[in-house]
Amino acid sequence: MNSGFFLSPPNYDSPAELKSLLETLGFAMQKKFGQNFLIDKKTRENLISFLTLDKGTRVWEVGPGLGAMTYLLLEKGVHLTAFEIDKGFISLLKKIFLENSKQNFTLIEGDVQKNWLPYLIEHGKPNVFFGNLPYNIASDLIASTVEAGVVFDTMLFTVQKEAAERITARPGNKNYTAFSVLCSLFYECKIVKTIPASAFWPQPNVESAAVLFKAKKEFAEYKNFKLFIKIVKALFSSRRKNIKNNLGSWMKSNGYGDKIDLVLERSGLSGNLRAESLALYDFLLLSDIIGHL
């Protein structure tokens, strides 16, 4: 391990050593933050291999925890900004990484969902957005970046496998949701690795998967981004109902009156279709038509 660090990093492959470290420092695992440590070194190295990292590449890491991935990233010479909410981990990360990595490592304390956009506005976008996301915030965080209209060149997130399947689902798939549509607007998304529960400590009750997001070279055109987001969510508001019922109800509640038949006629779509059968283009078309009413 690098002797230049203020506190030597622990053996990230050893649950016993990690547990001992936590107990020695008096840290309590905060279940509300969904902490699970990736103890399989080959998996950690494999995840890094999916990223194009050069010296000076700007990387954001979400939820570094004890710093297992942080250590590997800094070894690559990247300029790393880590977002961590747990006060105990913040204290430890400072002792391990901050003392002699001030030019390459920045630690942002607090809730990433509140901090990422203000930090981006002040410091600009990174090349890579990366993390082993706590299951309880994964979907919300990714959706918030899309809904803000912010597109990263590359994102790689390890999430609950179920969430990964929703992100990468295509029309007609049972896992296809509003979240799938939002992710497909700006990114080509694919599951690059399935990770068993045994690779983590403590073991979660579910499998995980790493999802690679690569920004599309060309984005689909849209006239009103905020309206598009609202309509996607409205169309999936009740999966058992067809698009005429879901969209018609939303239009009446949002000042568009009883014009659903006109919208469907202009779109060429059958009102009997359900949202899970619509492609990205169909959602964009419907939002453009409604935006011109």
UniProtKB/Swiss-Prot annotation:
Q: Is Chaperone one of the keywords UniProt gives this record?
A: no
What GO CC annotations are associated with the protein? Answer: cytosol
Provide the disulphide bond pattern: none
InterPro entries in UniProt = KsgA/Erm, rRNA_Ade_diMease-like_C, rRNA_Ade_Mease_Trfase_CS, rRNA_Ade_methylase_Trfase_N, rRNA_adenine_dimethylase, SAM-dependent_MTases_sf
Which E.C. number(s) belong to this protein? Answer: 2.1.1.182
UniProt main location, coarse: cytoplasm
Entry GO MF terms:
16S rRNA (adenine(1518)-N(6)/adenine(1519)-N(6))-dimethyltransferase activity; RNA binding
**Catalytic function, reaction form:** adenosine(1518)/adenosine(1519) in 16S rRNA + 4 S-adenosyl-L-methionine = N(6)-dimethyladenosine(1518)/N(6)-dimethyladenosine(1519) in 16S rRNA + 4 S-adenosyl-L-homocysteine + 4 H(+)
Query: Which residues make up the binding site for S-adenosyl-L-methionine?
Result: 36, 38, 63, 84, 111, 132
Superkingdom, according to UniProt? Bacteria
UniProt cross-references to PANTHER family, sorted A to Z: DIMETHYLADENOSINE TRANSFERASE, DIMETHYLADENOSINE TRANSFERASE-RELATED
Q: What does this protein do?
A: Specifically dimethylates two adjacent adenosines (A1518 and A1519) in the loop of a conserved hairpin near the 3'-end of 16S rRNA in the 30S particle. May play a critical role in biogenesis of 30S subunits.
Similarity comment: family membership: Belongs to the class I-like SAM-binding methyltransferase superfamily. rRNA adenine N(6)-methyltransferase family. RsmA subfamily.
HAMAP family this protein is in? Answer: 16SrRNA_methyltr_A
**Protein name as annotated:** Ribosomal RNA small subunit methyltransferase A
Gene field: rsmA
